[in-house]
C-alpha cells in the first residue's frame, strides 16, 4: 500500500590528508562550541533559525513583503552528484573507521547553504524503494541505467539520517518519484502565494517554472554561490522564445529523453519539435493536424499508429504529477505548515553528534553558525 513519510526533528570543497588529521581537526573545531560566535561572513545569515519568517534576497527582493518561500530539494540527485564528485574517485574524505564521508560533508554544506537563504519552509524529497506508476505504464522506463554502485547504496541511509538530524523534513511516497512530490508541493505552495525554489540539476523540472517558481541548479564552478537560479525567462531564452515551460512536457514527448529511456517520436528532434510546438501548441493538436506537418519523416512518423502512441505514452511518462494524495487516507499529501523552518527541537545537537561521528569539523563549524549554538 502506498504510504507517506514525513520525517523530521524540527528543522566547499576540502580534503583531509589522513583520518588522524580529520579527527584532530574535528576536536579543535568543536572545542568551546557554545562560546563560538558567527564570523563576519555569516553575520547576515546566522539568524536563519531565530528569524525563520525572513526570506532575505532569495528572489531579488520581490517577495520580501509576502515572506513565504518554500525550498524543495531533489534529494537523490545531490547524493549522486556528491558521490561522483568525492567517493567514486577514491580520494575523498574518510573518518578513522574508514567510512567514506565526502558525500555527507557535501550534503551538510548543501543544507546549510539553503538555510542561509532564510526560507520559511524547506523539505528534502527522496524516491521510495520499488517500482512506480511509470514502470507500470512502460516496463522499460529507466531500464537503460546501470545498477547503483554498492558504496552509494550504503551511503544513502546515512544521508537520510543526517537530514533528519539537521531537523529538515524528509518526504517520500511509495509508488511515485520524488519529482511528483516536488510537483505537488510546488503547485500547492504557488497557489497559496508562496515563491518556490526547486533545488535540482534535472531539466524535467523546467515544466514547473512560473513567475513564482524557479530552479536553483548546482553552480558549474566552485567559486561564489553554490547555486545558480534558473527562471522562466532563462527557459525562454534557452528555447529561443519558441515555447513556454508548460510546453516542455510536449517537447520531451516528441524528442524523447535517453537518460530516462523515454522513446519520443522517431524522426522528431529538437529542431523539428520547437517549430511544431510554436505552431500547434501541444501534442494533442500536433497529432490532430499531423497531415499538415512539414517534413516528410516527421509527418509520416506522427501519422503512424506507432508514432502517435509513442508520443502519447512519452508525454504521460515525462509529466510530473501535481496532485498527489495519500490513497489510504484519501487526503492531500502533506500540509505545507509541516514544512515550516523552525529551530531544531534539540538545538542542533543531533547534527553535531553526527558530525563528530563522521569527523566533519568544517561542517560542524558551519552548522554552529547557522543554528547559533
Task: Please identify what each model-predicted range represents.
Residues 30, 38-52:
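N-terminal mitochondrial targeting presequences
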Residues 93-94, 143-328:
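Extended two-metal-dependent nuclease catalytic cores across DNA- and RNA-processing enzymes
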Residues 49-169:
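Domain-level signal for Mg2+-assisted phosphodiester chemistry and nucleotide/NA-binding surfaces
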